[in-house]
Amino acid sequence: HIDGRLVSAEYDNNICVGLDILSPTGVMGNIYAGRVENVVKNINCAFVEIEKGVKCYFPLEADNNRHIFFNNKNNDKLNQGDSVLVQVIKEAVKTKPPTVTTKVSLTGKYVVLSSDIRGVNISSKTKKDEMSKKVQSLLLESLNTEKFGFIVRTNCKDVNESDFEDILKEAHDMSQKFENILQRATYEKAPVCLYKEKPLYVNHILGFPNDYIDEIITDDDNIYDTICAYLPENER
């Protein structure tokens, strides 16, 4: 730790190839039922309250009109007073507020659930990989993707068919988690936090291929316990 912030370092052959300093109190990745405070057309943005007194910036140029509203609507545009599903994609910086998007996602080791797509896509880095295509077919056959879709992560190019059960379980668990988030929003009044994202260091670890990591070292018992909770038992 440095001044209360977490330091994450990645080493390859004893050479530091990555260094991140993470805030332990950040809201990055958290999902909210946000309340639209106002829409400012002349600067092409909206401001969305995610917690009492916490307003976020929403750039309208990123708007794809595929919003999930929790109030009665007769159009798909953001309007003042709307209750809408948002996710924080950028932390506050000095005087700038956090940035949110309505393209909500949940990230796992093998797949990403996205509210912005339907069906199952493959990561652009592995579109031609045969194992990734097999995982795509598996998910298409097994999952309902009418409300949201999935992206097969790069990690899947290194899996075996013996991993398919774990991949399916992760995708099913994500589907249930997202449904629970939507369900909770029906009885919680905006603005309210519906889901807190995994710590950034956990997402960083889960993003590596199965055979990439030899060892994880930490001097913090809480971080150790958190990492163990997210890693499969055979990888601890």
Q: Residue locations for each model-derived region?
A:
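Nucleic acid-processing catalytic cores of prokaryotic defense/repair systems
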Residues: 38-40, 51
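Short alpha-helix capping/helix-loop boundary micro-motifs
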Residues: 69-74
